[in-house]
Amino acid sequence: MNNLKRFTKSIFSCIALSGLLFLGGCETLPPTTDLSPITVDNAAQAKAWELQGKLAIRTPEDKLSANLYWRHSEERDELTLTTMLGTTVLTLDATPNSAHLHVDGKDFRDSNAQALLERVSGWSIPINDLPLWITGQIGALDRVLAVDSNGKTKQIQNSQTLPPWDVTFLSWQPQSGAEVPYQLKLERGDLQLKLQLNQWQALGKPSIMLGEKP
């Protein structure tokens, strides 16, 4: 059995046991420690954020749906996939120089999160670019293919690897003072990812008022 089939089978088995056929439910975001919710004028101002949403992955052989929690900062990414009942099926903890993936009771490590996911799952998921796309931003190597009637980016393409990634922003929403995607679709060859952001919160260092102790 190849990596992709083994990986999706183990995750999907966990989800099926919990009775999750599609995404649903609402969970409280895990508490933050050194960062607090802030308001920003645009998503680019948020150097850190956390989101709660849904992720669906489709290939010709498999379909996978799960609840998604992601906490992102310049120093670290923490990503968790859970079932509707709250059962954790995958966790990824990554820094610029290391990555730890826990799935199906097994631990995997690498110096690069994107390389680790591809090695274990067979999926070439663009973890390095997703923080930009999730917030509706365009990377230096992204090409705009279409805009909507309001001039907002509708579709981009990234050709760092072939076949390229095509990213479609399906809908937008106001969150934390900024406008970020509500739903987006990523396609590369026969691999398709759909993300839905139910909650996106910009994070920053808490402000210290005059007279307060840090």
Curated annotation (Swiss-Prot):
Q: Where is the lipid attached (N-palmitoyl cysteine)?
A: 26
**TM spans, by residue?**
none
Q: Report how it sits in the membrane.
A: Lipid-anchor
Q: Where is the lipid attached (S-diacylglycerol cysteine)?
A: 26
Question: What does the similarity note say?
Answer: Belongs to the LolB family.
**Job of this protein:** Plays a critical role in the incorporation of lipoproteins in the outer membrane after they are released by the LolA protein.
Protein's name in the database: Outer-membrane lipoprotein LolB
- What organism is this sequence from? Shewanella sp. (strain MR-4)
Q: What is the lineage of its organism?
A: Bacteria, Pseudomonadati, Pseudomonadota, Gammaproteobacteria, Alteromonadales
Could you tell me the gene encoding this protein?
lolB
